[in-house]
Amino acid sequence: MFGGDVSAASVLPSHPISGSCDGFQAEGSDHHHSTMTPFQESQRNVYQILYGHPANDDFPRPITPLQITIPEGDASPTVPVSCGVVNGKMHLNLFMCPGIHQPCIEVGNDLLSPKQFTIRGDKERQKDWKASIRVGRSSLRTHMEAMTIDFYEHMNRCSGKCQSRNYVNAPSEEVLQARKSKRTSEAGQLKYEIENEMAGKEADNDDNRKSAKKARGRPRGSVNKPRQMVKMEPQDDRFFEEFFIDAPPLQSMSSNEEPTSSNKESNECTPFNDILNCLQNDPMNFWSQMQQTGVIGHFCDDIIVSAINLKQSVMDNPVTPTTANMLTRTAFALGIPPVVVHRVQSIERNAYQQRKHDEMFNDIQSTLAEEHSVKYQPRTSSSSQESLHTAREFTEEKVEELIDVCKYDDYPESECLPGPSHIQ
């Protein structure tokens, strides 16, 4: 990029590199050390800075050597950057916080901002503009996270808009160790919870426990909420001991008779009739125990699923006396009879209003039809009658004229006035 061999070595210049190079971290940094190999090119000093990484560094990615050009005078030092197929030089003293809209990249005779530089390199669709700009084989974000490149005088000129990724205020070693220990404790707690959950279901199956998949880690910042474990008393063999208070005594068995399978099951759990008896006769006791053990939500889900199935059955099939009684009992059990009554009244009101609306619409249609018939039919009949009357009067007048002429008696020719033929 610079037209010279970077590996060529020469004598170090006498002036230090700390005066005008505030945009990058030079030697003497607490976290990174560097070895510099300068060479001469077109009366400018170009240094290849190699940054090492300590053992406890939080950035394990390798960073390519950073080539910084130190011009003579007060000009800004530059580093070669690229974006796609476009190459340029970033002026470190012009790279100010937050950087995205600061003209600091020289491309030919233009001074572009990083945003304009990514647009020219056809990388504007990427959300992370720092990752789109390359400094050698590493991205600009990698160098900024490693503190090899920073905004110019960032401590004094920070705009407060650069904290989105929090790479400027790098966490200290104590904070990193606390985060690692927290993640380790969270992973251990999650593993302990999974083992406790699996212990109740697969206690007698060690092979399944070994072949179980490991749980994936949760995102940073998430908190593992403690699960509601079932409160089982280890010294009590029976889970719900209150179920046995009103239970009838078991039938006596002969000493020679071996216990049946039902008796074996009764030792493991409460008999079916005892639980059903408690559910029907002592619901307060039953549901209190369900709430205390943390399993009452499962029964509520079962009730909801049963209600959905009942709804689907009623909508798809004709109503039977069984389903009708079930719906009525459910409505009264849930305390919604007033809601049902109000809903029926609302449906009736809507039907009545619709019926009145239809009647009003029909009346309007009939009225308009009558007005239309009255408006056009009388005019046609009156005009025809007037025409007929006029024709009759005209005929009568003609007939009268003819009759009057015919009534005259014949006069002798001597009494008649001479006509036009006699005029000389």
Swiss-Prot record:
Stated role: Transcription factor which controls spermatogenesis and sperm cell fate by regulation of sperm gene expression.
Name of encoding gene: spe-44
Biased composition (Polar residues): 378-388
Cytoplasm found in the keyword field: no
Organism per entry: Caenorhabditis elegans
Sequence intervals crossing the membrane: none
One of the record's GO cellular component terms: nucleus
GO biological process, one term: spermatogenesis
Protein name as catalogued: Transcription regulator spe-44
